[in-house]
Amino acid sequence: MKLNKKLLMAALAGAIVVGGGVNTFAADEPGAIKVDKAPEAPSQELKLTKEEAEKALKKEKPIAKERLRRLGITSEFILNQIDKATSREGLESLVQTIKQSYLKDHPIKEEKTEETPKYNNLFDKHELGGLGKDKGPGRFDENGWENNEHGYETRENAEKAAVKALGDKEINKSYTISQGVDGRYYYVLSREEAETPKKPEEKKPEDKRPKMTIDQWLLKNAKEDAIAELKKAGITSDFYFNAINKAKTVEEVNALKNEILKAHAGKEVNPSTPEVTPSVPQNHYHENDYANIGAGEGTKEDGKKENSKEGIKRKTAREEKPGKEEKPAKEDKKENKKKENTDSPNKKKKEKAALPEAGRRKAEILTLAAASLSSVAGAFISLKKRK
């Protein structure tokens, strides 16, 4: 019994000591510890304005659709839901929801193939919003090359990949390149043919010739035609050409040309004949001058002595010397009186002026022949009388 009492007392004492210690520990609450916090690092998140966010959302929608298609989601109803997103965060949430629901029914095999990318987390935060690092998971394929899921660093790389992806032109015929908010470039294939840019028109060589109006051009052609026509007609004088070149209107050129041609044609068709003067030239013999050629000097007395010896000698001397021309004898007054009665002197002068030169010569020859015959006949009669 004594042992039991001692154990009991020890247990009670231990309990008192433990309880007091516990109560003492619980009563003394520890004070608040002050810890110096380090300054927060500046956020690497891109801060965009409202307009920039709208442009980024507009560019990311076709990229999101293309990625869903690559997963095998081709329903237009589901793809059209992408267009209803009003913010980049809403677009990201919608894509993740569609992806998770689709992957539950269509799990992706983990076996790697040539066409299967190394990473299957195609819709990480940095892909759509550009909030992550430049080189995140899925940026490069297993060969270390960039792919269209995560963009290309340069536009040239994106264009090369797009040309290679076109492959069969019967399906995809064109592509477009766009730059995401993350600064990387993406291509989107299209079945419509791209419009070929129009080539800039080549500049034609400038015409160095002096510019002229239509009236000046017509005047120039009219002058050239007029000069050519004058040359064709045989007119080569520079005087006429200069006159045409000085003309200031087409009408003036035509008028000058017609006047010159008319004057030139008049000279050829109606050549001027030499004027015939009524005055009698020297050594010219008229018909009446030979009426008394056998009578010597042509007086009345010489006419009466026509059958005398002196008259015969004079006639024979004249016949023996035919080369010497005799002076014309004066006309008989009686014959002049008779002719004055018939023809007036003015009329006689007009007839002489109108008579051509060839006709005069014929008349002179006939009168000479008649005079010689009359002289021979007179000589013959005088010889008979003597006998």
Swiss-Prot record:
The lineage of its organism: Bacteria, Bacillati, Bacillota, Tissierellia, Tissierellales. Pfam families: DUF5633, GA-like, Gram_pos_anchor. Residues 1-26 form the signal peptide. This is Peptostreptococcal albumin-binding protein. Binds serum albumin. The keyword Signal applies. Residues 298-360 have a biased composition (Basic and acidic residues). Residues 213-265 are annotated as: GA module. GO terms for cellular component: extracellular region. A motif (LPXTG sorting signal) lies at residues 355-359. The gene is pab. Keywords: Cell wall, Peptidoglycan-anchor, Secreted, Signal. It is found in: Secreted, Cell wall.
